[in-house]
Amino acid sequence: YAGGVFAEELLENGIQTIVLDSVGVWYGLRLGANGKGRGYDIHIFGGEHGDLPLIPTAGAVLAETLVRTRKSAIIDTTGFATEAEQRRFMADFAETFYRLKMRNKSRVTLILEEADDWIPQMPETTELRMLGAFQRIARKGRNFGIGLLAISQRPQGVHKKVLNLSDVLFVFGISGKHERKAIREWTEYNEIDEDVRDKALGMLPGLKMGQCLVWAPRF
């Protein structure tokens, strides 16, 4: 839900927004607040609600199209038959998108739903090219106008090189040991005061729906 609010704010302010959706839920941006009627004018590629289907070999073509037109889009990968097809598509997309943005600078935000699908901490061999492409976007993309919003229920599954590059961290209620360990490591990397860190981490299991803690140590 919080990610959707961010996306709405970006779209309201005319910022190109591209959602990489591996769960098939972001089509709701096109619906009105009551679940009916018209929402935002955003293209959907792939999935049950797609305007056009996704072809595993068309990642580079779609990246080129979105850079050229500067249109917002939802890329729904739920229709791919295999994980291999999804990884190939996203590797091609991310590599081409970054390369073209180097020559075509403009503001755009990539939203990675279930970010551990795209930037896994423990990648399989077939995920390495995709991971490398997104790592480069996370590390250097801001120089060309690319912002990155990574959403995950499993922060321990998100590659640490990318997680540690995050300027702002929103943490909603979590109680799992491994999840809290990943958050602790991020706060330690960013040199958050130990007393503040321990108090905040102790609050996480008790947060209610819609409540979150926000860390922004560089601001």
Q: What does each model-identified segment do?
A:
Residues L11, E95-R103, M130-L149, E191:
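Substrate-engagement module of ASCE P-loop NTPases
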Residues G4-E95:
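Switch/coupling segment of Walker-type NTPase motor domains
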Residues S22, E113, I146, Q153-R154:
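Conserved H-loop
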Residues L20, I75-T77, L149-I151, V171-G173:
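Conserved beta-strand segments of the P-loop GTPase G domain that flank and frequently precede/overlap
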Residues Y1-A2, L149-P155:
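Ser/Thr-glycine-rich phosphate-binding loops at phosphate-binding pockets of nucleotides
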Residues L29-R30, G79-R88, M102-K105, D116-F134, ...:
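Conserved ATPase-coupling elements of RecA-like P-loop NTPase cores
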Residues G14-I18, R70-I74, R103-T109, N143-L149:
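Loop/turn-to-beta-strand initiation segments
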Residues V5-E9, R30-R38, E48, P56, ...:
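Conserved ATP-driven motor cores of ASCE-family P-loop NTPases powering translocation/secretion/packaging/pilus
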